Amino acid sequence: MRPIKASISADAMAHNLRVARRHAGAARVFAVVKANAYGHGLSRALRAFGAADGFAVLTLEEAASLRQMGVDKPILLLEGIFDAGEIAACAELDLWPVLHHARQLDWLEQQRPARALEVFLKFDSGMHRLGFPLAEHAEVVARVRALAGVARVTLMTHFAQADDSAGVAWQLQPFREALDGHGLPWSSANSAALMRYPETVGDWVRPGIMLYGASPFTDVPASGLGLEPAMTLRSEIIAVQTLAAGEGIGYGQTFRADKPMRAGVVACGYADGYPRHAPTGTPVVVDGRRTRTLGRVSMDMLCVDLSECPAAGVGSAVVLWGDGLPVDDVAAAAGTSSYELLCALAPRVPIEEVGRNQEAGRGFGNE
């Protein structure tokens, strides 16, 4: 069998949820499990995040899967309903849709659900992505409260720069000033806001990336936040090449040796989810030693520098990210984010669960 695999630790995920809960205080916690739980598998996330107060997903299909798995806790639909036909499913499955544009309100006025829904009413406080304008808050809140198909309302916004130096005040202050007078519960904190800005906690928090052991910040590593990596992508060296000075390796020969050296060929490529654009120098660990990639990443293989790994050879263990090599470090070197790397794990990569919670055994990335 090809040696690449991803090890996923439910124990690490459960630990990271406990970290989130410590920051949340008395607020309730939605575990964000969209995008197949950031590539970790929805069923695995469900077992790991059993202590969450609810789950946040993107689509009706994800929500239905959670209900089929036996989840009876609140499920938040982060983009709400996409057409009037989804209202009935929200009622049947007891889902909490996010309402963020007027057509959704029109649908709820025209088609009363079989049971009144709990909804999250989203306002745009400056990110300019989803949400009603804050200037329209009085009219919008009154309209939603008047809907016979709505049982309870929670106010919501999302931060654009909680993870950088601009912070959240420029969004949080106008959001609170506009909406506090309505006397409704509210939710604003994502992972970055939850860990850095306690004033954003509100009544519900929505941690995502931190639950999977990656840092939401570029200036603080995950270990510095007390987080543990949930996914470790491993493989092995399947060939060793000896390069003379001036010789290149891989497509385009973009790397050329400046002296004689050994290079290892690793069974991992962009078809496995490794970033194709990762340049020479992207960190990798071989037999416990940190080294670097060489040249272009191929579909099924990549090459690594063995200069500092004299004992390495065919069969040597390689960590692409995870235990001993933060996914954030790989993402930074490749000019991307840990979110993208984790979500991009390919279905062809076998997954092995580690830790106490191993009911699913060995499977594949799309399970």
UniProtKB/Swiss-Prot annotation:
The keyword Endoplasmic reticulum does not apply. Pathway: Amino-acid biosynthesis; D-alanine biosynthesis; D-alanine from L-alanine: step 1/1. The modification N6-(pyridoxal phosphate)lysine is found at K34. It catalyses: L-alanine = D-alanine. Gene3D superfamilies: Alanine racemase, Lyase, Ornithine Decarboxylase, Chain A, domain 1. Substrate binds at R129, M299. The active site is at K34, Y251. Its cofactor is pyridoxal 5'-phosphate. It holds the Pfam family Ala_racemase_N. GO terms for biological process: D-alanine biosynthetic process. It comes from the Bacteria. HAMAP family: Ala_racemase. NCBIfam families: alr. This is Alanine racemase. It comes from Thiobacillus denitrificans (strain ATCC 25259 / T1). The gene is alr.
